Amino acid sequence: MTTEETKFCEVKNNEIKEFAQGFKSPKGVLETAKNIYYWVRDNIQYENYSNTRKGAYKTLKEKSGNCCDQAHLLVALLRTAGIPTYYAHGTNHWWTVPCIDKQYHCDPTNRNHQFGNPNNNHGGNHNRFSLHNSLNH
């Protein structure tokens, strides 16, 4: 499982590392992951464009991004917190899958989504997907 940095997932960025520290929970890794997920879901505005334009750091700074860039930010924060996390790709959509005691599908692009339980109201498909260590487009 992966916690490493990739092209748009800037795990080694000092600002991302410092920011991720603020989400650590004394209740454990699952609560830390939920804290990170809900912050991204509630604070990063969705923008509609194709592919990646920003990466994790710029998405954090601008507080906006499409599904790819929101996935980059969420993966970077989770990996920085030591949580192995994959990118998931379904029909025309990307989201994240942190692996703690099991795999949790986490899509921060809509405030109706819950940690580990995204719905399909954006037109993507969370039921048919593939997992990836990186997203490089």
Regions found by a protein language model. Give the residues of each.
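Hydrophobic/aromatic-rich core segments of domains that either
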Residues: D69-N136
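Secondary-structure boundary elements
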Residues: T2-G65
